[in-house]
């Protein structure tokens, strides 16, 4: 049974049940979709293209100038430019996208998720232009996409709602009064869109105005609509959503629920299906409520009804309905063995749903972990950079949805998600084992990611037993985040880094030896002395020094220099010493296998090691993956010396520090607001600038009271990560 279920999952796209238990009506083959334009980018565009190709349907990609060489462009049958990088001029330009579809001869447009996927105006424009919109009717998008309107509809239908304000009057004084009526803390949320963009938790009236205005700006930038709703903030909630599907013959069913409680910045980072620790009766209630919600607006195609579950009272409340395919839809596909994109196309073609409710299977358990380019230590701020090394694990029960390849750049213009790692197991425990193993094998070098943090989440004892809620990260922050004041943790971190630094040294030198042994350099004096007569000098214990700079997350983002002395032994082993009192000499045997792979023996343990290296700005950047550990080191180029070589320069990696009061950009981004003028007096914590990157705003505040100096930025300027923005001085 399990093997059959696994076969169904791994061939989602090859074999599907076709039991027509629902009313079907008449459908004509004369208008079947043969060519689809995918109005999106990244992993979801690649995902849609993959299913379309299997069905024999041609695909058209659209791209901005920033995405000309992207994977979603390369995988489509053809691609059409729609504008410059800013989303409002390209992926949010509905007229340009419809024009591209007509020019390409496509009969249908698939919006993916985000961008125009929940725009009723865009769905209507498609239909008016003679194009099939692969999604719900514009009326349902309008009713349910507007979170205030959807709550009014659900309230009228008797669905429980969280206390809040969902009215049309957006006057800020009115909103302040409503917030007072609801009672703090309140949740500020845009009425359109999703993904946590624009959401703010406000704890006191003093914070309200600034948070409200920032939420409006983010909503306008992300969704083109800046209206806001208010809700009472439930202190211990779970986020559980139900996947629903309808067809144009009046049939609606659900495909069970997903738990999306583990979030940061109000964005999901680990999702799972089915939800853990709920009863069959509770599951049934959720399903019935979700189907009723969909039927209330004559819904068809894919949708998700989101509920907030109060873990104190065990009551659930309607939160919102997403009228599109969700980012996390793969976990549902894994437990029901169906391709939801194929279902979307079937429904768009006028066909009935391929299964009835009683035929929908529920097999095993699935997790999805979202891999983001972000700085966890900086509060999960988005990061940019080049994927110099990118290796993902894939197997019969492990699936990776991605829109990038090695060498691609993650830019500031779009969402920083690199990939979705999806795993399946026969039960939750088995799936969790695969999730932890796959995360340990997920390799990215070139920019910071949240992979290490996801590993901490997956390995946490509370997560293992399914004790999840939306405050999971805050509740267990002492376990999940580093504490520079914890001497035990600091020592453990240093010892792990020291071990991996030693393995790095042995692996890099062994690879050089391997290459030079097969390509003798002819005694070049430019090479280290122990390679002047390959393989090595007989009876000469050549030594080599290396200095590696380790990014020490246990030291508040500071780095630590590790000075290594490597001695080659006649038996092919390396003795590696670290210049620190009490550090033992480590004996390492390294065997180069191929590419980035090594087989290493150290401290009585033999295991596989992966080392990725790239050079930039006269620095060699080195990443090592060993077991569940990943470490990142930097080395100045040209600093490797043999003991026999004379050098006037002692190896040294410089680190720069800015003067006290200097404020640097926490991320690469766009200046969207300058709140004070240069040489103005500010108070500690006063907002000075607002930066935007990947549709998220970040307020830059004064670090102390004083006068602003060096503030020369203007709205519309781009700043790089770490660049100096201004300083605050006493005078």
Swiss-Prot record:
Domain Biotinyl-binding: residue ranges: 653-729
Domain ATP-grasp: 151-349
Entry EC no(s): 6.4.1.4
Domain Biotin carboxylation: 32-478
Residues recorded with modification N6-biotinyllysine: 695
UniProt binding sites for ATP: 147, 231, 266
Record-level GO cellular component terms: mitochondrial matrix; mitochondrion
SUPFAM superfamilies: Glutathione synthetase ATP-binding domain-like, PreATP-grasp domain, Rudiment single hybrid motif, Single hybrid motif
InterPro entries in the record: ATP-grasp, BC-like_N, Biotin_BS, Biotin_carboxylase_complex, Biotin_carboxylation_dom, Biotin_COase_C, Biotin_lipoyl, CbamoylP_synth_lsu-like_ATP-bd
GO biological process per UniProt: L-leucine catabolic process
Function: Biotin-attachment subunit of the 3-methylcrotonyl-CoA carboxylase, an enzyme that catalyzes the conversion of 3-methylcrotonyl-CoA to 3-methylglutaconyl-CoA, a critical step for leucine and isovaleric acid catabolism.
Oligomeric form and interacting partners: Probably a heterodimer composed of biotin-containing alpha subunits and beta subunits.
NCBIfam families listed in its UniProt record: PRK08591.1
UniProt name for this protein: Methylcrotonoyl-CoA carboxylase subunit alpha, mitochondrial
Encoding gene (name): MCCA
């Amino acid at each position: 049974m399990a093997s059959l279920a696994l076969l169904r999952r791994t061939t989602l796209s090859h074999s599907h049940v076709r039991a027509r238990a629902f009313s079907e009506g008449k459908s004509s083959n004369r208008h079947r979709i043969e060519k689809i334009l995918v109005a999106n980018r990244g992993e979801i565009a690649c995902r849609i293209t993959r299913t379309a190709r299997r069905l024999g349907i041609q695909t058209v990609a659209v791209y901005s100038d920033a995405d000309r060489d992207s994977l979603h462009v390369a995988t489509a049958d053809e691609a059409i430019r729609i504008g410059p990088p800013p989303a409002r001029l390209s992926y949010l330009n509905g007229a340009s996208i419809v024009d591209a579809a007509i020019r390409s001869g496509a009969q249908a447009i698939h919006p993916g998720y985000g961008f125009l996927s929940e725009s009723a105006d865009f769905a209507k424009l498609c239909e008016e232009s003679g194009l099939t919109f692969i999604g719900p009717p514009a009326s349902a998008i309008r009713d349910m996409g507007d979170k205030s309107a959807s709550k009014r509809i659900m309230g009228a239908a008797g669905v429980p709602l969280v206390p809040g304000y969902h009215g049309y009057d957006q006057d800020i004084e009115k909103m302040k009064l409503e917030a007072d009526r609801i009672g703090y803390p309140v949740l500020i949320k845009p009425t359109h869109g999703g993904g946590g963009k624009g959401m703010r938790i406000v704890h006191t009236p003093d914070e309200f105005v600034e948070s409200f205005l920032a939420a409006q700006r983010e909503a306008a930038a992300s969704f083109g609509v800046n209206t806001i709703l208010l809700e009472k903030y439930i202190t211990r909630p779970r986020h559980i959503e139900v996947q629903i599907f309808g067809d144009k013959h009046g049939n609606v069913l659900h495909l069970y629920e997903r738990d999306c409680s583990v979030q940061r910045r109000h964005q999901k980072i680990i999702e799972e299906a089915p939800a853990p620790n709920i009863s069959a009766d509770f599951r049934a209630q959720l399903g019935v409520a979700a189907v009723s919600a969909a039927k209330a607006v004559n819904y068809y195609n894919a949708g998700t009804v989101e509920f907030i579950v109060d873990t104190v009272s065990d009551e659930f409340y309607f939160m919102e309905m997403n009228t599109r395919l969700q980012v996390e839809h793969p976990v549902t596909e894994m437990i029901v063995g169906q391709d939801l994109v194929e279902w979307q196309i079937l429904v768009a073609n006028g066909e009935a749903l391929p299964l009835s409710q009683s035929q929908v299977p529920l097999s095993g358990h699935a997790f999805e972990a979202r891999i983001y380019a972000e700085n966890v230590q900086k509060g999960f701020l988005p990061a940019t950079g080049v994927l110099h090394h990118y290796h993902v694990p894939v197997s019969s029960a492990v699936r990776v949805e991605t829109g990038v390849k090695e060498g691609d750049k993650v830019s500031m213009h779009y969402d920083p998600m690199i990939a979705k790692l999806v795993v399946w197991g026969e039960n939750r425990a088995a799936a969790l084992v695969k999730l932890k193993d796959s995360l340990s094998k997920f390799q990215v070098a070139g920019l910071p990611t949240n992979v290490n943090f996801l590993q901490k989440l997956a390995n946490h004892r509370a997560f293992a037993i399914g004790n999840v809620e939306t405050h999971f990260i805050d509740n267990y922050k002492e376990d999940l985040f580093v504490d520079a004041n914890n001497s035990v943790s600091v020592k453990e971190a240093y010892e792990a880094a020291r071990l991996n630094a030693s393995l790095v040294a042995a692996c890099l030198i062994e690879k050089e030896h391997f290459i030079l042994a097969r390509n003798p350099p002819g005694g070049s004096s430019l090479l280290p002395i122990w390679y002047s007569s390959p393989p090595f000098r007989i009876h000469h214990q050549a030594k080599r020094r290396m200095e590696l700079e380790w990014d020490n997350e246990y030291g508040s983002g500071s780095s630590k220099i590790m000075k290594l002395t490597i001695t080659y032994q006649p038996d092919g082993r390396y003795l590696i010493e670290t210049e620190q009192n009490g550090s033992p000499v480590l004996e390492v045997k390294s065997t180069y296998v191929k590419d980035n792979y090594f087989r290493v023996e150290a401290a009585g343990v033999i295991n596989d090691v992966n080392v990725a290296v790239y050079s930039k700005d006269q620095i060699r950047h080195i990443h090592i993956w060993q077991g569940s550990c990943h470490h990142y080191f930097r080395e100045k180029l040209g600093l490797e010396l043999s003991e026999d070589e004379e050098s006037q320069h002692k190896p040294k990696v410089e680190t720069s520090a800015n003067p006290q009061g200097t404020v640097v950009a926490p991320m690469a981004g766009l200046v969207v607001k300058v709140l004070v003028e240069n040489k103005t007096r500010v108070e500690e914590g006063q907002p000075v600038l607002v930066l935007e990157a990947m549709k998220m705003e970040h307020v830059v505040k004064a670090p102390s009271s004083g006068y602003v100096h060096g503030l020369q930025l203007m709205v519309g300027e781009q700043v790089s990560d770490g660049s100096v923005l201004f300083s605050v001085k006493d005078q």
